[in-house]
Amino acid sequence: MQKYFNLEWKEIEMFEIKIKLTTESCCLIGNQTESFSVGGVDQSTTIDENGRPIIHGSAFKGALRNIVREQEKKEGQMEKTKEYVKCIINEILEKYRSEDIVKTEKIEKMILNLENKVNSKDLKAEYIFGMEGINGLPRIFCSDFRVIESKDKKIGDYFLIDTKNCIEEINGNILSNPRTYKVIKPGVEFEGVIRFYTPFPIAAKEAKELEDSMEKELRCALELFNNGIYGIGNSKSRGYGQIRVEFCND
């Protein structure tokens, strides 16, 4: 029986990292505009169905991917993650090279793409976040980060209204354009989960060793949020987006 491109593999959860996230500065997540009113805000951080702030998993995942991308440029960093990515790409190639899979033009192109990547010195650790054009690749999933509720806090206690000047040049003139933002206050606590799934279990001992090493490297990358260099959301150059992360399942 011939198999086609969209193979269905059962995903296996390799590890889970539960995270408590605390805002250290004001944070502006997403680009949620509110209905205009005199004295209203120009831009608001995203909110959930109950009106509380929310940090969408895609925003956190994108910020983490940026850290991994920056770290792997440094010698000796993210090496075990790269090794795991190489093992997985070889697993995918083995499956797609099998004789019972129809070699469509799309699959042939994908195989060539993977062969080039696995044999390249530029094999990237960030491929654990997914690879364009490749189905079934192991990847990181990130939940939304939701507020840790407190009986003492009302909806308004999570937000600040902040005004910053936006400098614009119009017809050779430098103009100051004040803009108002509804942002998350410093000190607001959120919780969320990162999970890593793979449809390709490799040899038990090798898999366990790589899993432990890769999780350790990912935790080290997450801890870099705490040094003040990396942040999340918009307007980081203006001081927004500073956070602190703690691991809840240590």
PLM ranges: what are they?
Residues N171-G172:
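Surface/interface-facing alpha-helical segments and adjacent flexible terminal/loop regions used
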Residues L175-N177:
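A short, acidic, amphipathic alpha-helical segment used as a generic capping/interface helix at domain edges
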